[in-house]
Structure formats: structure tokens, C-alpha cells
Amino acid sequence: MSLTAMSLSIVSQNKVFSGLLTKYSFLSSVLGGLEAKMNVFVPKEASASNKVPVLYYLSGLTCTEDNAAQKGHLFEAASQKQIAIVFPDTSPRGANIPGENDSWDFGTGAGFYVNATREPWSKHYNMYAVSYTHLRAH
């Protein structure tokens, strides 16, 4: 399923330097129907007729879609260079798999960019598909 086939909901929008930062939520089929979130920064010069490069910023351990957007200090340079930035959450949230939150460095918030191959993880833990295929398709 592509992003264009998904229902994106705008959670918030903020003007940042000469662009717009929008937080979206959507139901992700590759995460087993869980809600996923991402922040997208678009410089003001970007449009359908003026495409700009896109940087996908994959945050690390214990991060959400907000960490780099709030702390990365990237928007001034992205505005100047006319670069869009996508900040996806790098973990599925709400899978409620027994034991997934027993350790801070495994499970929710761990930020592994792989697809799980074993049950019960394989239904929801497909962050490679989300980060490298699902979001980049559009």
C-alpha cells in the first residue's frame, strides 16, 4: 500500500524558518494495522512543479518521529538548500506483544530497521518495509 492510497491525518503544522513542518498519522498495513506517525518538513519553494530532494532521517534507539525534528537543528540549512526532510517513527507502537517493553533497548523504541521474520514480532515489527519501501514509494 502506498502513501497515496493511505489516509493521512494531519496532527499538527508549524512554520519553521521558510518552510512548514507537518506531523502526520496513518494506519500502516505493513505494521499490522498499527497507527504510525511521521514529521515532514517542506521548504516553501517546493511545489508540484518545483520538486526538491528529500532526506529521510532515521532516528536511533528510544527515539520517535519528534526527536530529530525537535533537537536536530536541521531546518535552517534545509530551508537554505531547499531540502525536504521526512522524520518517521522508527518503531511500531501499540503492538502489545508480551515482553516487548521489558528492556529499553529491545521492542518499542528500539529503532531496528529490519523486518522481523518470526512470530509474534513479524506481524508488527517491519520497520525496513516502512522506512525503506513504504514511505519512499512517494
Which stretches of residues belong to each language-model region?
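Eukaryotic N-terminal low-complexity, Ser/Thr- and Lys/Arg-rich leader segments
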Residues: 1-7
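Short substrate-entry loop that stabilizes the transition state in hydrolases
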Residues: 48, 52, 59-88, 93
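Conserved small/polar residues in nucleotide/adenosyl-binding loops
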Residues: 133-138
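N-terminal cap/lid segment of alpha/beta-hydrolase-fold proteins
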Residues: 8-45
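Secondary-structure boundary elements
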Residues: 47-48, 132
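Cap/lid segment of the alpha/beta-hydrolase catalytic domain
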Residues: 87-129
